[in-house]
Amino acid sequence: MSVAAKPVTVQYFYKIKWGFQEEFLALFDRNHWPLLKAQLESGRLLDVRAYEPRFHGDGRQDWTYEVTITYKDWAAMEDHTDPAIVRSLYPDAEKLAREEQRRMELLEAHWDTPLEEHALPR
């Protein structure tokens, strides 16, 4: 299997403004998750998992929501969501754009981290 054909895992970190966690999650679940789910079903994505910290941490909380996506390969990661999927799930493109803009407005920070697996000795 060539390097290009290997799965690629990326962590997407979100630091949500205090008091807006529920609104952010509602928008994510309504607008972003269905797009990810459709791409899981199509095979572009191999796995999607979402996490929240269980505890408040040690006083330094860099993120409040994290999504880990495993793409089938680098090409899948570099492609954008198929516009046909977006149109089929969200015929009201203006509403989707407004709600996605609002979701981003609720953030203090957002960053993506592509991961390189470190093989542990056996």
Can you annotate each of these PLM segments?
Residues D47-Y51:
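A short glycine-rich, hydrophobically flanked beta-strand micro-motif that places a catalytic Asp/Glu
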